[in-house]
Each structure stands twice: as structure tokens, then as C-alpha cells.
A protein has these predicted regions:
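Surface-exposed repetitive/solenoidal architectures
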Residues: 1-283
């Protein structure tokens, strides 16, 4: 199903849905902490059509999980398509259930994700870690009356033990919940969010924000959203900047994102991003 040995220098190479499920089951049935730290690279796009997905990494208790994922998952620019989760009684719902100090990078997800609370396209919950160059195209929903922290990238970020870094990420999926954000539904402290954008509709019954729905920090920089994309009912982030559909379409937002990239010598991630033009903004 996979090649490699799961280390930083020789990560598992995964190219199929069967291989992805094998990895998920290895993490969720880990007998030692090291088994939750295994490293993965995707070598192909993966289609999960016909699969009701169970998340990678299990959130236990209120905010954290002993079987949370703590390794490095590198999508290598690939997409996990047709992700499907419909569990309105579950918390920590997403491709990953709970990430504890891990790294998720270079990954796009599409499909539909529904949970009770702590629900995200990439991860339902996170305590620190790094999420970079990730994109959510999923419709993401959680309970709009209780709990209901919902985000395009991360549903709920506690950041009790680790610093959370989110950079070069975007959402174009529809996000709905009690506390809803295009990138993160709710986060507490110790986070830095930079160079991200939202062009998906975000609806929150308590709090809504284009980047973060409800939060306790203002460490947001160079983040943008499509004007009118947030259906706001209190709360929401105030550090992101609204841009018109014209500014998305004419390259203005693209250039702002490229200017904010960490590595000026690398290929600009914004050049590869979809949905930066009005013509592209379709699901």
C-alpha cells in the first residue's frame, strides 16, 4: 500500500485511498507516541469517492487527544478529492481529527464535512503546529446552536502546549457553524496567521470572521477576503482586509499575497492558487 518507513528522511509514500486509510488506522491505533509522529508524502491526487471518512488523529476529552497526529504530512501539491464526513454527533471532524504540534503542508481537500463541533476541512482541532500552503474547497458545517466551531482549514485551535502557525492558506468552501471562520473557526492564543485569504461564504450564528470566527489575539497579517463573503452575527476578526471581486480578478490580491511570501526565491505559491480570479471562483 505504501513505500518508505515513515521517518523524516524516508516518509511513507502514499498514492491511493487504501494507502491513506492504512496511514489513518496506523495513527489511530498507535501503541506508542512515536507512531503518531510518522511522516507522509502524497505522490498522487487521491479520490475518496464512496468512502465515509473517519478522521486521522482522535480528539479525546474536551480539547486534546492522546492519539492526535504529531508528524509531518506533505501533500506535495496534491488534492484529496471527494472527502465525505457526515457525523452530526461527533467532535474533532475533518480529514484530520486532531493535530498536536504536527505539520500539514502543500495539501488541498475537496468534498463535504459535517460534525457537531470542532469541524474543519483540513483539521477539526489543533494544539499548535504548522499549516502551510493548504486549501479547503469543502463545504464545512457544524452545529450552529451548541459548540459549532467551524473553519475552512481548522475548526478549533487551542494552542495550549504549542504555537500555531498558519500561512499561505486559503478557503473557498462554504463554512457554517456557531463560531465560523474561513481559515479557523475559533482559537485561543499563541497563534500567527499570515498570507491567507478567504473567498468562500462564512456564516456564524454567534461569531463569524473571514479569517478567524472567534479569537483572543490579533496576530493576523497580510490576510484578505472577498468583500461580502461573511454573514456576520457578532465577533469575527478585524485584522483581515476586504477586497472586491474586481481586485481578486485583476491580480491585486495575487500580488499582495506574493509580496508576503517568506521565501522570495521559491516559486510564488499565489501563482499556483486557484480562485484568485472571478472566473475561477467556482466549486
Amino acid at each position: 500500500l505504501v513505500t518508505g518507513n515513515g521517518t523524516v528522511t524516508d516518509p511513507y509514500q502514499i498514492s491511493t485511498a487504501a494507502g491513506l486509510k492504512w496511514f489513518r488506522d496506523k495513527v489511530n491505533n498507535a501503541k506508542t507516541p512515536d507512531e503518531t509522529k510518522i511522516c507522509v508524502e502524497l505522490t498522487e491526487d487521491i479520490d475518496l469517492s464512496g468512502e465515509e471518512w473517519s478522521p486521522i488523529g482522535i480528539g479525546q476529552g474536551v480539547y486534546w487527544g492522546s492519539l492526535s497526529y504529531s508528524g509531518t504530512f506533505d501533500g506535495k501539491g496534491h488534492t484529496i478529492k471527494n472527502l465525505s464526513i457526515d457525523n452530526s454527533s461527533a467532535n474533532f471532524v475533518g480529514l484530520f481529527g486532531y493535530v498536536l504540534g504536527g505539520t500539514i503542508r502543500n495539501l488541498t481537500v475537496s468534498g463535504s464535512v459535517k460534525g457537531s463541533g470542532h469541524t474543519g476541512g483540513i483539521a477539526g482541532g489543533a494544539d499548535g503546529g504548522t499549516f502551510e500552503n493548504c486549501a479547503n474547497l469543502c463545504v464545512v458545517q457544524s452545529d450552529s446552536t451548541e459548540g459549532g466551531t467551524t473553519g475552512g482549514i481548522i475548526g478549533f485551535a487551542l494552542n495550549m502546549d504549542y504555537v500555531l502557525i498558519v500561512r499561505d492558506c486559503y478557503n473557498v468552501g462554504s463554512i457554517t457553524g456557531r463560531h465560523a471562520g474561513g481559515i479557523i473557526g475559533q482559537c485561543s492564543w499563541h497563534e500567527t496567521i499570515s498570507n491567507c485569504y478567504n473567498a468562500g461564504t462564512v456564516t456564524g450564528t454567534a461569531n463569524a470572521g473571514a479569517i478567524i470566527g472567534s479569537y483572543s489575539s490579533d496576530k493576523i497579517s497580510n490576510c484578505y477576503y472577498l468583500d461580502g463573503s461573511v454573514i456576520r452575527k457578532g465577533g469575527g476578526d478585524k485584522a483581515s482586509i476586504a477586497k472586491t471581486a474586481t481586485e481578486f480578478a485583476d491580480g491585486t490580491v495575487r500580488e499582495l499575497l506574493k509580496a508576503g511570501e517568506r521565501d522570495k526565491n521559491a516559486d510564488p505559491w499565489a501563482d499556483e492558487c486557484k480562485y484568485l480570479t472571478a472566473a475561477d471562483k467556482t466549486l
